[in-house]
A protein has these predicted regions:
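A structural signal for short, well-ordered beta-strand segments and their strand-loop junctions
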Residues: 95, 103-104, 122-127, 243-245
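Conserved catalytic core of nucleotide-sugar-dependent glycosyltransferases
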Residues: 107-220
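Short catalytic/ligand-binding loop motif for oxyanion handling, primarily in non-cytosolic enzymes
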Residues: 13, 42-45, 102-104, 131-136, ...
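Active-site-proximal specificity loops/subdomain of glycosyltransferases
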Residues: 35-95, 101-108
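C-terminal catalytic/acceptor-binding lobe
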Residues: 1, 16-17, 168-278
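A conserved hydrophobic helix/loop-capping motif in glycosyltransferases and polysaccharide synthases
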Residues: 3-11
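Short, well-formed alpha-helical segments that are part of the catalytic scaffolds
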Residues: 10-29, 43-47
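Short aromatic-enriched loop/helix-cap "lid" or pocket-rim segments at secondary-structure transitions
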Residues: 47-48, 107, 135-140, 255-258, ...
Length: 278
């Protein structure tokens, strides 16, 4: 089985992303989409319920405690409590955070194929535009120019060289540049410029966790500090490599430190992603 899990959720993003997931459900690739209800926003909760009604393979999952927001109306420190629903032995789980707003055709299939071909890998990670480590790599290969500033380059032994680079996830000019560059490349048909080699890593990297894939049989169970744990610590503890699928491309809209700026601009980029999501 293939199950998608999404800590959920914000209507303005899910209304775009669901079109991709629904299409893959219709194609028979996805068996279930778990919406992990992690918000107190009543409008968003109503939207999640409408999604559950409109597609029989969408199901809302809850936890037996109150959601206490840390940012906006959701609590990232409670997300780990939903992992108990993602531990069936015969299932491949793929996490997409609710602000993954574009996935290249074929990327999901590439992730699943990598999961099957690399059974010993602890996690499979895709190539995510606007994720800290990938932004650094995209600048290194020239897919994203440095005209608005450079993010930190890799430092051997420093797992957080990109993750803790505040410029990487807070600068307003950089996030504009990231989205504008993607839109330009999309229109000119040069998205392959972002591609990186598929690679197994035994020297762990701090990957973004807004999308990753694991086996249910591994009984993955992070704690409240899931970011470093899912990014590299669990893999290191398991003593198993991770696998990066460099040609499985997707777009992460915003870190919470970028969101206020984009919202104040009117979320102008969402119109593009909505128009290109089918």
């Amino acid at each position: 089985k293939v199950v998608i899990v999404t800590p959920a959720g914000r209507e303005k993003y899910l209304s775009i992303f669901k079109k991709f997931i629904y299409r893959k459900i219709k194609e028979g690739l996805i068996d279930e989409w778990q919406l992990w209800l992690n918000t107190i926003n009543e409008n968003d909760i109503s939207y999640l319920k409408s999604m559950e009604k409109e597609n029989k393979k969408v199901k809302i999952y809850t936890i037996d405690e109150e959601i206490v927001p840390t940012w906006e109306s959701y609590n990232a420190l409670q997300t780990h409590k939903f992992f108990k629903y993602a531990q069936e032995d015969d299932t491949i789980y793929i996490r997409f955070d609710d602000d993954i707003i574009w996935v290249e055709e074929g990327a999901l299939e590439k992730i699943l194929q990598a999961r099957i071909d690399c059974p010993n890998a602890s996690f499979i990670y895709p190539n995510i535009i606007n994720s800290t480590i990938c932004t650094s790599w995209h600048q290194e290969i020239g897919a994203l120019s440095e005209e608005f500033g450079s993010v930190n380059k890799e430092k051997i032994g420093d797992l957080d060289y990109a993750y803790l680079d505040a410029f990487n996830y807070t600068d307003s000019k950089l996030i504009d540049h990231i989205h504008k560059t993607f839109i330009k490349r999309f229109k000119e048909g040069s998205l392959s410029a972002y591609y990186l080699p598929n690679k197994s890593f035994k020297d762990y990297k701090h990957f973004s966790i807004c999308s990753l894939c694991w086996w249910g049989k591994d009984k993955i169970q992070p704690t409240a500090f899931e970011e470093p744990q899912l990014g590299w610590e669990i893999a290191e503890k398991m003593k198993r490599p991770v696998f990066f699928v460099g040609n499985a491309l997707m777009v992460h809209y915003a870190y919470h430190t970028q969101r206020e700026y984009l919202t104040e601009k009117g979320d102008i980029y969402l119109d593009f992603y909505n128009a290109t999501s089918v």
